Amino acid sequence: MANDKGSNWDSALGCSYLLTEAECESDKENEEPGAGVELSVESDRYDSQDEDFLDNASVFQGNHLEVFQALEKKAGEEQLLNLKRKVLGSSENSSGSEASETPAKRQKAGAKRRLFSENEANRVLTPLQVQGGEWRQGFNEDQAISHRLLQLVKSKNATVFKLGLFKSLFLCSFHDLTRLFKNDKTTNQQWVLAVFGIAEVFFEASLELLKKQCSFVQMQKRSHEGGTCAVYLLCFNTAKSRETVRNLMANMLNVREECLLMQPPKIRGLSAALFWFKSSLSPATLKHGALPEWIRAQTTLHDSLATEKFDFGTMVQWAYDHKYAEESKIAYEYALAAGSDSNARAFLATNSQAKHVKDCATMVRHYLRAETQALSMPAYIKTRCKLATGEGSWKSILTFFNYQNIELITFINALKLWLNGIPKKNCLAFIGPPKTGKSMLCNSLIHFLGGSVLSFANHKSHFWLASLADARAALVDDATHACWRYFDTYLRNALDGYPVSIDRKHKAAVQIKAPPLLVTSNIDVQAEERYLYLHSRVQTFRFEQPCTDESGEQPFTITDADWKSFFVRLWGRLDLVDEEEDSEEDGDSMRTFTCSARNTNAVD
């Protein structure tokens, strides 16, 4: 039985046709994918033909030129605004701005696009975009380089960046040429400067400006793609601090202070001296003045070959001639002498400076002590008179004793016995109320004689009298009852002027004749019965008159020059017979003490 073609529908049902042939959305959902594609395309084609066929109205073309000029004007205003704000963006920013447009603007732009053909719009806009992009790209690259350099200088690694740039330009580290000064207030006469980003005009002009302030100027400038750097070696006429030099050079070279590196030069490094010497030979280097001594000394062939060895005896002789017996004083002063003394320079080059200083101080103390002990009291006083400088008058001492109602002849007679160390006359005590000038008088006399001051606060130590072994006179200032009791108990023979045994630390006890002793006190030892055994050993002078004015200052001052005039004036009255004067009159010549090895061919 053959199959019938067409649709089978029941004629009894009047609406069966609609149920069979009508298209419904539910039917599309049940269809397979792609089943109705051809049908939809075909239907669209017929619809478009029908639409074009039915729409015969004329299209309004509009004013193309006016719209184009409006768009160009708007684009020009946007470019001008971007230039004024200095925010010329890259192509990425421009693409981002296009992507951020609102849907309304896109629809509006799509409507206007109908006025132009697609190819015509591309032909007009493409050349402008290419030319503007190339110019903006070149400008942005230069601006990026400048911005990157500025950021590096301002960053926390600015010092690392500047040191790296200096080393890449000069093939030498900045720290190899300089030594470190941590404090900006520390002054120095010579400075090394590294200036970054300096202009050629200011670099050349700085030489003429620095000639007035520097005795030596050496400057050189180098450049490469990473930046520009100039190095200066300046020897100022006066010492300047880093802060002063920074302000001076920043204003002179018209650069930021962050673009400067400043440190004093390394004057003891051979590599640093060779760097400056080699740079001075370059035609690109600008110079003014002669090379510093430390560069010539290290680069001259004669000086480099004739390096002297350190002579310890020469150092001891120098310290003895200057009467330096303290270790710190010797070390400091001998280091300062290195600029003019070759042996001092050799001393600084040794690895045993502390040992040499300690041994030198020990030897000088031995020599000075032996020299002092070998002199008689008149010869010793004459030596002290030679050390006193200035003009003085013995009348100031006379006026002071007259003010205290003490006859000067009485003091002269007591001082004569005191200087000669006569037993029972070896101690002078100045008694009186406070502020009467007792300490002023005794301290000035002890200072002139170069004596020793004893502090009773250290009496519990076995070594508080150790300084008497090297002293020609001693002073105990402001003795109290405890001090007088100690004298009465332990130091009667010292007050008498007889030999005593002195205990010295880490050394054997030494026996010496007790030196003359001065004592100041507010206690009248002659009126105290408890110190009966000291009455015959101490000769007292009473000071009753106060020595202060209304403002609390002392109107009397006695200096070393006054004591020098006093001893010269009363030399005969004090029985100071100098045996050395008699020997000089007999024709004996005095020779300076020598404690260093001299040339054996020299004439003695």
From Swiss-Prot:
Q: Name one GO cellular component term.
A: host cell nucleus
Tell me which Pfam families the record gives. PPV_E1_C, PPV_E1_DBD, PPV_E1_N
Post-translational modification, as annotated: Phosphorylated. Sumoylated.
Residue ranges, compositional bias (Low complexity)? 90-101
Q: Could you tell me which residues belong to the region DNA-binding region?
A: 141-307
Positions where Phosphoserine occurs in the chain = 90, 94
Please report which protein family the annotation says this sequence is part of: Belongs to the papillomaviridae E1 protein family.
Provide the protein name. Replication protein E1
**Native organism:** Bos taurus papillomavirus 2
Classification lineage: Viruses, Monodnaviria, Shotokuvirae, Cossaviricota, Papovaviricetes
